[in-house]
């Protein structure tokens, strides 16, 4: 009953019109009135911001802010996979041969997440990693490795929240929400970077258009907090053992190691 009521509430309020109104407000000068309160409530680290708080004219500008030069360093080890975002490490684990994985008791389909069987088959037996971005985090997304971009595509329309309630009661938000996917071929092995939209504000802006990408290079930004899912082929990586659920991650921090193949 609780799950049904939750989903009904989301469906009734999470339409195109609602999203449009909220997006327009966030991009308007009127939204600047709540910037100080927003920064205080979400405890935004103002020392890292490229500009002073008063220089942001709209909430959208604050959401998509850049960091001061040198505030993040990208792990330079050739075998490292780095966090593509600032966020909270949610989970990681194996992708079953059935092309599914489990998070918090809910089963997710890679076929649904990527849109078809052919794409999903690449990741059967591989590894998934999930990183959650709250409204307080830096919202720009960077590449976790270097390689050639093989595909970019968008799926889904509406979005459930990706907080604890959304993960428990929502309709498989990681594989059904509005999402933008970038696939990268790195030395013959594939990784999918799945950028999952948050409730109401689905916008994910792509910034990278070249055929190749370097580790740490900026690729896109969220216009609000959301989630990133990383999918890796079988025997491609080993997740850093020290990573724990709930741990804060910073852009460029090593999260996995590429496995050597003879």
From Swiss-Prot:
Cell membrane in keyword set: yes
Cofactor requirements of the protein: pyruvate
Cofactor annotation remark: Binds 1 pyruvoyl group covalently per subunit.
Biological process (GO), any one: phosphatidylethanolamine biosynthetic process
Catalytic site: 86 (charge relay system), 142 (charge relay system), 226 (charge relay system), 226 (schiff-base intermediate with substrate)
Residues carrying Pyruvic acid (Ser): 226
Pathway entry: Phospholipid metabolism; phosphatidylethanolamine biosynthesis; phosphatidylethanolamine from CDP-diacylglycerol: step 2/2
InterPro entries, per the entry: PS_Dcarbxylase, PSD-B, PSD_type1_pro
UniProt function note: Catalyzes the formation of phosphatidylethanolamine (PtdEtn) from phosphatidylserine (PtdSer).
Protein's recorded name: Phosphatidylserine decarboxylase proenzyme
Annotated gene: psd
